[in-house]
Amino acid sequence: MAKIKARDLRGKKKEELLKQLDDLKVELSQLRVAKVTGGAASKLSKIRVVRKSIARVLTVINQTQKENLRKFYKGKKYKPLDLRPKKTRAMRRRLNKHEESLKTKKQQRKERLYPLRKYAVKA
């Protein structure tokens, strides 16, 4: 089997990708048997290509799966941990903008009774 390109895989459906993955795994097992029995050098060099092709297929499957999950959870209140933005622990625990802007009754009263004074400087 020739080297597989990821862009060719992206257009395929999941069933097709899984079938191709099975074919590649069968081919890899045959190549490994040929390696043990003393197969040709062309077959031995093909092992690497097949392994990388399997990795490409799995990568495309996982990426499309994650993309679909992102679409599903878009706009929802709760998301799985792996779909949330990766921040530091401190940043995740920080107050959000709304919580930061909240003021106590006492603070609101003080600001209302004693507004900020504006001074004009005479030139």
Swiss-Prot record:
GO BP: maturation of LSU-rRNA from tricistronic rRNA transcript (SSU-rRNA, 5.8S rRNA, LSU-rRNA); translation
InterPro entries for the chain: Ribosomal_uL29, Ribosomal_uL29_CS, Ribosomal_uL29_euk, Ribosomal_uL29_sf
GO molecular function, one term: structural constituent of ribosome
Residue spans of biased composition, Basic residues class: 86-96
Per UniProt, location of the Glycyl lysine isopeptide (Lys-Gly) (interchain with G-Cter in SUMO2) cross-link in this chain: 25
Positions where N6-acetyllysine occurs in the chain: 19, 43
Residue ranges crossing the lipid bilayer per the database entry: none
Major subcellular location class: cytoplasm
Pfam family, one: Ribosomal_L29
UniProt keyword Ribosomal protein, yes or no: yes
Modified residues (Phosphoserine): 29
Tree of life domain: Eukaryota
PROSITE patterns with a match to the protein in the record: RIBOSOMAL_L29
Keywords, alphabetical: Acetylation, Cytoplasm, Isopeptide bond, Phosphoprotein, Ribonucleoprotein, Ribosomal protein, Ubl conjugation
Location of region: Disordered: 85-123
Protein localization: Cytoplasm
Gene Ontology cellular-component terms listed: cytosolic large ribosomal subunit
Matches recorded under SUPFAM superfamilies: Ribosomal protein L29 (L29p)
Family indicated by similarity: Belongs to the universal ribosomal protein uL29 family.
Role: Component of the large ribosomal subunit. The ribosome is a large ribonucleoprotein complex responsible for the synthesis of proteins in the cell.
Quaternary structure, from the entry: Component of the large ribosomal subunit.
Protein name listed in UniProt: Large ribosomal subunit protein uL29
Gene that encodes the chain: RPL35
